[in-house]
Design a protein with these regions (language model features):
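Flavin-dependent oxidoreductase catalytic cores
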Residues: 1-225
Length: 225
């Protein structure tokens, strides 16, 4: 039966993020990003609709943001602030995670994140009722990234002001920048392989002109059969 973490258990969860950061660096990654979006645990702590706690991790925006700050602090201890970023998704509503006062919540959070001198703040594009990008820009003293549903043209218009992020398109097109430069067609990501085991959907997407065989499936150039 699901239950809320006891207050004394929360520090051990932050330590799990610390260990994950250490392992990522040992594996050769340049940096780490805290996924505090899409209804995952950090956003569940942050959002008033899911956080019903009455201890120091619940109630006010400051308390609800405490878990995120403590996790980031643990990650920074391992990687340094210049190699640690965060992704947030105001009002995405994914996994039914909602907040009664998102502007107040995210205003406090972004101000607090700026104090940590993170490598960047990654904003997921959402259909929010308020302009969260306009809210974040003057409050965050660092690079601001925007991602989600972008293509070459929409990303180009953003790069002059901030930075653009590609996720699933990069997964499906390991040579994405070269394809953009050449105006070449793009492979569509196979969503049925997301969060699955094995190499399919991870390392079997070809670059232009390349053919890869995985099992009995032949993947070609800019079109997946």
């Amino acid at each position: 039966m699901p239950r809320a973490l006891d207050t004394g258990e929360i520090a051990s969860v932050a330590d799990e993020y610390r260990r994950a950061t250490r392992h990522a660096l040992q594996a050769g990654f340049d940096g780490v990003e805290l996924h505090a979006a899409s209804g995952y645990l950090p956003e569940q702590f942050l959002s008033s609709g899911t956080n019903q706690r009455t201890d120091r991790y619940g109630g006010s925006p400051e308390n609800r943001a405490r878990f995120i700050v403590e996790v980031l602090t643990a990650m920074i201890d391992e990687a340094g602030s210049d190699r640690t970023g965060i992704k947030i998704s105001p009002e995405m509503g994914f996994n039914s995670v909602t907040d009664a006062a998102p502007q107040e919540t995210y205003r406090y959070l972004v101000q607090r994140l700026s104090m940590l001198r993170l490598a960047y703040l990654h904003l997921a594009r959402t259909r929010s009722a308020f302009d969260y990008r306009a809210l974040a820009r003057p409050l965050f003293n660092g690079p601001l990234l925007l991602g989600g549903g972008l293509d070459r043209d929409s990303a180009a218009s953003l790069i002059a002001q901030r930075a653009a992020v590609f996720g699933s398109l990069y997964l499906a097109n390991p040579d994405l920048l070269q394809r953009f430069a050449a105006g070449a067609p793009l492979d569509a990501p196979d969503r049925e392989t997301f969060y699955s085991d094995g190499p399919r959907g991870y390392v079997d997407y070809p670059v232009l002109g390349q053919t890869l065989e995985v099992g009995q499936v032949d993947w070609r150039g800019a079109a997946r059969a």
